[in-house]
């Protein structure tokens, strides 16, 4: 059946333009009217006929010309062979015929390999995948790079083909190789906004911390190109997907990675990529996709899930095995509590002035860090709810926590004021004690300043939390 022509010219060199004159290669499925050779043709005319047969996808004529003695690896003006042209348009049947006739699957022209050409082809992923399977079955090397040091997996990631990426890795492709600009396959996927490819690469062990030559990580590249969901996911400290399939054999890897050919898996995984939130991504990484509906029915968000205890997980119908996976992930996500240091026992009345001063200084410094953290949150918080990229719980939950924070800060402020009054009282008593030898005034003044600064800092933190609370209420 005939199909319309592909309007662009096939260009050699991995998408780089050529200054050579037009070779007339409009690759595509043109008029597929059966043609037969009327008799022996001169060499030049035979090559021109061969080119037209390839252009039109006339497989029977291609086979007849090959039978007449024309070389299957005949190169044309750009130096491309017939196999490269067939791969560039993902003509699976033509690729199969040429390979069966002895075409060189490892051929390259200026480091542009047939496999790279197939990976960067314009066509459906299904056809591209089949062409690449054929080339890999003929020992095409998935790690040979082009002049820009881009490997086939980078082209597949750039063009958004997760199954092709998986197939290449199953045949030995290196996931973390870098091109001339320091881009990895993950960087390319993040740059182009291909979330499904990002997920697949992380599952295959891609390192999200590798930097480009200008010092950018994949998450920063995603942010720069306004792919905020990918940026948020890659910014998570935990990568539960990483290396998930490393322990499988080659056959198991191919089977597992390509099982998405079934309609059921496509519906469950690929169709849901467009609607993935942070909860789905987290569960997918742990292999707990089956829990998504359960958690959504119970209105449990990721942030709620991350704060649940083991008994709460059990009450919500989560099995022991799934609980273990979640708790292990939560353990990796735990944030270290701020440690102020331990004071000597006050009851012994042996606390030194230096130790007490160090405690106050440390407390004051930590309060300053907390104030800065809240200021950053207020600055970064989206002004409008429609700008929030990932799934959020009800703002009422956030407001409730802010209310508790304000209450705690008020309590802290009250206690610090009591401490200040107590120290002031002690200071006054010592000054009025005729037996006391007064210390240097500078020390007394310094202690007073520290106490005042601590009290002011705590009060300021309370005001900031109050502002934060009002901000959430407005949203």
From Swiss-Prot:
SUPFAM superfamilies of this UniProt entry?
Ankyrin repeat (SSF48403), Pseudo ankyrin repeat-like (SSF140860), SAM/Pointed domain (SSF47769)
Which Cys pairs are S-S linked? none
Which residues are annotated as modified residue Phosphoserine in the UniProt record? 17-18, 20
**Record's Gene Ontology CC terms?**
pi-body
Q: What does this protein do?
A: Plays a central role during spermatogenesis by repressing transposable elements and preventing their mobilization, which is essential for the germline integrity. Acts via the piRNA metabolic process, which mediates the repression of transposable elements during meiosis by forming complexes composed of piRNAs and Piwi proteins and governs the methylation and subsequent repression of transposons. Its association with pi-bodies suggests a participation in the primary piRNAs metabolic process.
Spell out the PROSITE patterns in the cross-references. Answer: ANK_REP_REGION, ANK_REPEAT
Q: Which protein is depicted?
A: Ankyrin repeat, SAM and basic leucine zipper domain-containing protein 1
Q: Name one GO biological process term.
A: male meiotic nuclear division
Where is this protein primarily located? Answer: cytoplasm
Region Disordered: start-end pairs: 1-24
- Taxonomic superkingdom: Eukaryota
> Where are ANK repeat segments found?
45-74, 78-107, 110-144, 148-177, 181-210, 214-243
Q: Encoded by which gene? A: ASZ1
Cellular compartments annotated: Cytoplasm
What SMART domains does the record tag this protein with? ANK (SM00248)
**Subunit (UniProt):** Interacts with DDX4, PIWIL1, RANBP9 and TDRD1.
The UniProt keywords, alphabetically, are:
ANK repeat, Cytoplasm, Developmental protein, Differentiation, Meiosis, Phosphoprotein, Repeat, RNA-mediated gene silencing, Spermatogenesis
- The protein's organism comes out as Ovis aries
Q: Where is the SAM domain?
A: 272-334
């Amino acid at each position: 059946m005939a199909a319309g022509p592909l309007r662009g010219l096939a260009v050699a060199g991995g998408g780089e333009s050529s200054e050579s004159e037009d070779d007339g290669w409009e690759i595509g499925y043109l008029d597929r009217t059966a043609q037969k050779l009327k008799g022996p043709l001169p060499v030049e005319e035979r090559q021109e006929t061969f080119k037209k047969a390839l252009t039109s996808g006339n497989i029977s004529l291609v086979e007849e010309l090959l039978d007449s003695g024309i070389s299957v690896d005949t190169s044309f003006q750009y130096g491309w062979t017939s196999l490269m042209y067939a791969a560039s348009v993902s003509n699976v049947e033509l690729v199969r015929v040429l390979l069966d006739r002895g075409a060189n699957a490892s051929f390259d022209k200026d480091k542009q390999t047939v496999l790279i050409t197939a990976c960067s082809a314009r066509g459906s992923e299904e056809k591209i995948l089949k062409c690449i399977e054929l080339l890999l079955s003929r020992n095409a090397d998935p790690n040979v790079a082009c002049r820009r040091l881009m490997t086939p997996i980078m082209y597949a990631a750039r063009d958004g083909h997760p199954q092709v990426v998986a197939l290449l890795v199953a045949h030995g492709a290196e996931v973390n190789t870098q091109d001339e600009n320091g881009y990895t396959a993950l960087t390319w996927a993040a740059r182009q906004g291909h979330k499904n490819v990002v997920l697949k690469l992380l599952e295959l062990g891609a390192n999200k911390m590798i930097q480009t030559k200008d010092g950018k990580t994949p998450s920063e590249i995603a942010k720069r190109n306004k792919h905020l969901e990918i940026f948020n996911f890659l910014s998570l400290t935990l990568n539960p997907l990483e290396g998930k399939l490393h322990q499988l054999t080659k056959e198991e890897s191919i089977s597992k990675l390509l099982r998405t050919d079934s309609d059921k898996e496509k519906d469950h995984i690929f169709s849901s990529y467009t609607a993935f939130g942070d909860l789905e991504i987290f569960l997918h990484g742990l292999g707990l996709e089956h829990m998504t509906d359960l958690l959504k029915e119970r209105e449990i968000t990721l942030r709620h899930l991350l704060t649940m205890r083991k008994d709460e997980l059990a009450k919500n119908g989560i099995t022991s095995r799934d609980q273990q996976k979640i708790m292990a992930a939560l353990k990796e996500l735990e944030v270290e509590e701020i440690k102020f240091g331990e004071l000597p026992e006050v009851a012994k009345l042996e606390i030194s002035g230096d130790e007490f001063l160090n405690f106050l200084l440390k407390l004051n410094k930590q309060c300053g860090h907390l104030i800065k953290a809240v200021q950053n949150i207020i600055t970064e918080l989206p002004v409008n709810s429609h700008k929030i990229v990932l799934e959020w719980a009800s703002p009422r939950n956030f407001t409730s926590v802010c209310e508790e924070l304000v209450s705690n800060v008020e309590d802290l402020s009250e206690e610090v004021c009591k401490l200040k009054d107590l120290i002031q009282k002690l200071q006054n008593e010592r000054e009025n004690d005729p037996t006391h030898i007064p210390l240097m005034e500078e020390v007394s003044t310094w202690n007073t300043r520290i106490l005042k600064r601590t009290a002011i800092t705590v009060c300021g933190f309370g005001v900031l939390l109050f502002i934060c609370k009002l901000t959430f209420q407005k949203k």
